[in-house]
Amino acid sequence: MPLNPRRIVLDNGVTVIAKSNHTTPAVSILVGVTTGAYSDPPDRDGTAALCARVLDRGTVTRSADAIADDLDGRGASLSVVAGRHQMAIAATCLTDDFDAVLSLAADVARHPRFDDDEIATRRESLITTIRQEEDDPGSMAVDAFIRALYGDHPYSRKVRGTVAGIEAIRRQDLVRFHQKGFDPTAITVIVVGDMEEEAVSAAVSKLFGDWAPSAGTAGVKPGVAVPDASAPVQRRLVSVPMMNKSQADVAYGFVGIRRSDPDYTAMSVMNNALGQYAIGGRLGDNIRERQGMAYYVFSSLDATFGQGPFSIRAGVSAANVEKTIASIDAELTSLLDKGFTEQEIDESKSYMIGSIPRQLETNAAIAAFLLTVETFGLGMDYDQRLPGLIGAMTRDKADAAARRLLDPARAIVAVAGPWNAPAPA
């Protein structure tokens, strides 16, 4: 059944998207903000990540304890996350509590307190998370891969930030980040659940409509300009020795595409056929099932405002690192030489089309889907057009997508774990 959500834009630039779903007496609220780690100051990596952790820890009129008690008393939830280009406040509640929880979400978005004590506590928590990642081969392989792939491009910076950057952040940095990024023109409020769509629009207008946009925005949504990333011209292998670990992790890949790229759907079908879901696909069938070399292996297409990475990840024993990399090389070389089979593409398209309803089974999932649709300007009928877009993909288009991105001679390969790269010949 088509979603057919209601979309309006308030006079101050806030976008409101509502979708009624009366199957259960519950509501999901998602407040998307077009800002994130990409906007971190150069010497304050982690500002968006720390802001997300502190944002719901008190507002001008509510303490952190008062917020927690209010949510607990209603059986509701509220959380804040930060990505590279977007932050989001996500809340769930019963229908009867919608007005109160939406009011809380608006208060968190508009009037965070940024208490010094909360900042200190959340800073230490975030640093602990980063330290834990530094002890994880998977995280370290990805970090090394991204740094080598992007060099001095902004995408080389970690979304979570660095210990040094986070330690340097002070209250005024968070206040400045919030004032600059949390403008009504950057806000999208999505409500999905047991509410009438007109009532949602009225409620959001009441709580967000008096928020004055910054001078110069004129109610126009902010654009996100990301420079092109230079694709590596030769292959590079990076090793992160972690000799106390039992498993090595491999990150292998290339500079990918923007979400706005006309080849996005073809790339998605290609990625699925190659091995998006770990079990199945060329990579999984060969490296994991037939050869039994990998604990996991999958491919990933991360297309956003800029050219995110196209990556292949694998977890292996140290003894199988070189064999696994060689197998990935061989699989990509074979793909570039012979292409996919018609069966592979048909099965991938069938799976992708069949998974659309499953991806929209919950209010929260629908809200997240609609936020993506709004963020990238895909159109409120995208759920209706998507099956046709996927169905129109052909073997030739998937093969062309592979040839455009995948070249083992230009791959960046990073390995973290109990393994040392062999000395150059």
Across the structure, where does each feature detected by a protein language model lie?
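Non-catalytic beta-strand/loop surface segments
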Residues: M1-P42, R57-D99, A120, T129-A186, ...
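A common structural junction motif
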Residues: D107-F114, K206-A215, A330-G339
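Active-site SXXK
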Residues: D45-R57
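Short alpha-helical scaffolding segments that buttress acidic/His motifs in well-ordered protein cores
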Residues: C51, V101, A105, A109, ...
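Charge-rich, low-aromatic oligomerization/scaffolding segments with amphipathic character
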Residues: A100-L104, V200-A202, I325
